[in-house]
């Protein structure tokens, strides 16, 4: 009892099968996912999840927030999100009203590009994940290893992740996604612009990296073998 060991989550075989089934490896050509690419947040709509920061960041990136034109980094390949880019928000929670007010205050174009989709589960949710261009983990508290991130990688959807808690362990910069400073809407906005500039070829490589991450770290058998190895090393000491 002299040691405490924390290991990351693993995905069950059924979750892996679901991820493979909903993975969309032709998003750029897909009639819906290609013509209207979207960022996806799925989870509880609460302050600690950074949902208001995310909405503000999207408004800035899309040029729909006051002063947003001056907020972007000069080295971005894309200065403003093309108007075909959307933000999908799946879930419910105490900040829904504040989100609706924020969207309404930004005008009708914001309302047309930010979709509050409510609660989803099962394959309905997973298809939303699989068709998203990027998911966003905007948490502002220290999560160990958010399951939503693992589900996203299993569906070969790269992540925009806050640099807090265990989230950076999921995101290899430019490979499985991009990171930003937690709580910083401008930094998140700039990450969104990076995403919009990713070519089809580079995106395909990112999807491959997502699949490789899950295969190397999150399969049940791999997890069990790593756990057995860890126990054996602890016992030997």
For the regions a language model picked out, list residue spans one by one.
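Carbohydrate-associated surface elements
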Residues: 10
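Conserved donor-binding/catalytic core segment of Leloir-type glycosyltransferases
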Residues: 29-49, 53-59, 88
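Nucleotide-activated donor-binding/catalytic signature segment of Leloir-type glycosyltransferases, i.e.
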Residues: 77, 98-120
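Short alpha-helical donor nucleotide-sugar binding micro-motif in glycosyltransferases
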Residues: 119-120, 127-132
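Short alpha-helical segment that forms part of, or immediately flanks, the ligand-binding pocket
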Residues: 126, 144, 149-154, 168-169, ...
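Acidic donor-binding loop of glycosyltransferase active sites
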Residues: 130-144, 157
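Conserved acidic donor-binding segment of nucleotide-sugar-dependent glycosyltransferases
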Residues: 173-174, 178-185, 194-200
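A short, well-ordered alpha-helix in the C-terminal region of glycosyltransferases
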Residues: 201-217, 223-226
